[in-house]
Amino acid sequence: MWGRLLLWPLVLGFSLSGGTQTPSVYDESGSTGGGDDSTPSILPAPRGYPGQVCANDSDTLELPDSSRALLLGWVPTRLVPALYGLVLVVGLPANGLALWVLATQAPRLPSTMLLMNLAAADLLLALALPPRIAYHLRGQRWPFGEAACRLATAALYGHMYGSVLLLAAVSLDRYLALVHPLRARALRGRRLALGLCMAAWLMAAALALPLTLQRQTFRLARSDRVLCHDALPLDAQASHWQPAFTCLALLGCFLPLLAMLLCYGATLHTLAASGRRYGHALRLTAVVLASAVAFFVPSNLLLLLHYSDPSPSAWGNLYGAYVPSLALSTLNSCVDPFIYYYVSAEFRDKVRAGLFQRSPGDTVASKASAEGGSRGMGTHSSLLQ
């Protein structure tokens, strides 16, 4: 069921490409801005809905009827804010609690540093969503101004791709610990963990920076709506947005996912060759890898399809499918805490001890149970911490 849910934006995108395609000539009254009836030049397929700047008002964009219908439909105004709301309701407390426990209860290990940064990235992603939820629920009306729009866009993408990069760092740490345990004693130090965290944050910041350099708020023609990032002028696509989002998809998603595939592939092979006593760790590693691929590949594949053909009508309104697929990608921040932290009996015991101020003597039984489970699967919690 989850697989179908995550793949439906791709199906929607291909159905849009065969049906309501973006026309190369706007047939709406005044949409070409003035008396020039010539066909607009073919530009690269746009990141957002293709907007034509009105000749007498540079703050207003005219959209084709097909794009306008998708922009104002139930998917962006109801489904997308519902998905973002789920991330906020589940991801905020789950990641906040996990970060608190990791910072106050967990041992100061290099792997703990990586998991703390992952929890922080997922937490910041959830905190970046309320303005976008308000925007979509208000029927695509952005009330916060241009600067806030740029910051909200950069925060959404920066923290999401920062999470992907940190997931890759965690996979490398797990690879060293399980595939090269002897070498890991020398390599898996605080210096390596700190370097991986700094590299992930700096890369995420560099990828998000171009999202703050171009104007992103425009008024929708024949309405009172001010759009944030959802409709952008065609002439800005090839020069700015195409390279910016191509780099985001390739460097922020597919390259880290490739690293995760290689690291977790080797980890799975090592666990499988070790015997049945690693069965739980084997299944958990497979779930971690599958969730990352399932949540991030559809939206980033749609993003690259935008720029795979020079004609704006080649793929139709793929952006209409990209918006919900992006919202689905943010759901990964809700899943991370449960497959990286709360799956561990030892971590759950630390949560209970922290919440209810239980002394170590009160948790002997639960710790003994966790240790017994660890012996049965080759250190249950060590796979995560």
UniProtKB/Swiss-Prot annotation:
A Pfam family recorded for this sequence: 7tm_1
Family from the record: Belongs to the G-protein coupled receptor 1 family.
Membrane topology (UniProt): Multi-pass membrane protein
Name of the molecule in the record: Proteinase-activated receptor 4
Superkingdom to which the source organism belongs: Eukaryota
Gene Ontology process terms (BP): blood coagulation; G protein-coupled receptor signaling pathway; phospholipase C-activating G protein-coupled receptor signaling pathway; platelet activation; platelet aggregation; platelet dense granule organization; positive regulation of release of sequestered calcium ion into cytosol; response to wounding
Renumbered residue ranges of the record's region Disordered: 21-42, 362-385
Membrane spanning stretches: 83-103, 109-129, 152-172, 193-213, 248-268, 284-304, 320-343
GO cellular component: extracellular region; plasma membrane
Function: Receptor for activated thrombin or trypsin coupled to G proteins that stimulate phosphoinositide hydrolysis. May play a role in platelets activation.
Site note Cleavage, residues: 47-48
Annotated signal peptide: 1-17
Entry PTM: A proteolytic cleavage generates a new N-terminus that functions as a tethered ligand.
Organism: Homo sapiens (Human)
Expression (tissue specificity): Widely expressed, with highest levels in lung, pancreas, thyroid, testis and small intestine. Not expressed in brain, kidney, spinal cord and peripheral blood leukocytes. Also detected in platelets.
Extracellular side: 48-82, 130-151, 214-247, 305-319
